[in-house]
Amino acid sequence: MSSLASKQGPRYRHTADSSEPYETIGVEKLTPIIGAEISGVDIGKLVSDEARSNRQMDEIHRALAENLVIFFRDQHITPQQHLAFGRKFGELHIHPAAPHEGDDPALMKIYADKDSPRANGEGWHSDVSCDLEPPMGSILYIRQCPPSGGDTLFANMYAAYEALSERMKSYLDGLTALHDGEQIYRGLYANYGVADPPAYPRAEHPVVRTHPVTGKKALYVNNGFTRHIIGIPRDESDAILNYLYKHAENPLFQCRFRWSENAIAFWDNRCAQHRALWDYWPHTRAGTRVTVKGERPV
């Protein structure tokens, strides 16, 4: 894995945003490149108080755009409040495979204990990128944590793209790749009694997408769902994708979030990847996730 360093200094040099100060929330960056903890927000009250909501929501939108993933601690919310918070960002996405909690299929169940055959999201990915219109964001609420471990890592795909050479950027711009959920999802949730549909989503997306809000370019391939680049021989595709996967996993682009009970993470799937660590067996980690619909990548 490259350090992106040279005798002339780092190949990738992050320039911090010169933003105006926030008025209704506190924003403490985890790293200069990705991630921030948000304070001064009570999400339970936010979803029920329109007077409070509008200004804070504007600043939460801004914090997400600037930091790609934001975290809220000590949030004691109900399932209905979790769903309502997600709906403030758009229509909710229904996962094509995962079990849900309660009556609303938009409330995805997140659970792993000593008897689980697997845990959600152990490899680097962008959520459900196999959909024709992949989700724009995911909001994960963890109610129960193991004594240690269970961290989630996030990586900045703007930075991953920007750190590529100009020749590589020129080559990738305009290419598309197939994202397919079949290998990932079929049989994945059999332990919950989930029956597989006849087919899972698959779609072609740009290898480099442009974020609809920020206008920035982001690398949009991931080891979980991307199968091959369209229009080139498979061996070339494999070599390029394997390079891009390793490049995107460089720690320089990452932050690592240590969970506490009743914490929330909200990440932008259009410009960030993530992976969960299952290093806490035989302990339990439990929560729910709400996912917001997105647009077709361009």
Placement of each model-derived feature along the sequence:
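Non-heme Fe(II) oxygenase catalytic core, chiefly the N-lobe of the double-stranded beta-helix
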Residues: S2-I264, N269-V298
